[in-house]
């Protein structure tokens, strides 16, 4: 490798790391040292992660209705540095890795100027939906980006009659779906749908050997991630607890979660702004049919996002649920450029980007006082004179209390 290439790689890594630091520092306010603010869910993840580091087994000693991946990431964060600093470092590395990966993928499909614009749009949508950072979707964001890029590469080959699917890509799909299974199963909806499309295409073309290799690689990838967690929690007598928290409960939640007013204008605007990444491919397919070009590519992309889109429309899905789907936005932007035959992205693309900034400011206050809410402040005042080695009953206390008070919950259902 030449010195010039090494310098280019170093510059790319440094630039994207600095961008990731800025995004995390200013917008991921629940883990950023800039803000004295903690979210309810993020506090639970952090407390369980710290407890795991200290030897307290999730689900047995500290319980929450999530898969173990998010607790594992928070445990790693607390192992790197105390408090939320370690988690913040992991978030920076996560965002930087996604940007670096997207840089090398998009550079093959678009000019440098367009790559920058696509990444700006991606980041603006991310800060709109990230809800303070350290969410379940963040833990699988990098894998999601890799799966999307590998999938798109295969779709492009299919469009020119090359149907062979790489078993290595199938292995990555399995790793990603397993990671989603161990966090929130609906995060893997696009990958699962795309895998079904791959199976259908290979079966239709009677490529049985390639189909068998891909399915085997997918299963192996799934097992590689799932087995260590299954063995660990099984050895600690917590497998059934883990299974209920990561699968049974979330399946019930997804089945019974319905928006109270799905036809209201407010809900429609909320959905479009937060779930535009999975709405985009369907819109592009309609455009491709009208323009009569790139129809096969956009049909496969639309079929891949359709189940996730139907679920998001019908459920009471929070904005951060879209984080794991967000990398599909990169592919959609590339396809928009190809469909419209733009050499350069029009200037109004930046106007759309500014709209997301306005939406962000509207939904979240960029500058605010921070600190605990009124109930947590009252709880802190009541317990300020209680010695740290004493225990007490904490009824209806927000999990953020334990972080502000620097106390460790004794009861495993501390989040209820």
Residue ranges and their predicted role:
Residues 65, 196, 368-416:
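Short periplasmic/luminal acceptor-recognition loop of GT-C membrane glycosyltransferases, typified by
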Residues 89-111, 146-149, 153:
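Transmembrane-helix motifs of polytopic, lipid-linked glycan transferases
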Residues 100, 273-308, 329-332:
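Hydrophobic, aromatic-rich transmembrane alpha-helices
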Residues 102-126, 141-142, 161-164, 168, ...:
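Transmembrane-helix signature of polytopic, membrane-embedded enzymes
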Residues 166-185, 191-196, 224, 304-313:
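Membrane-interface alpha helices of multi-pass inner-membrane proteins
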Residues 189, 308-344:
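Hydrophobic/aromatic-rich transmembrane helices and adjacent perimembrane loops
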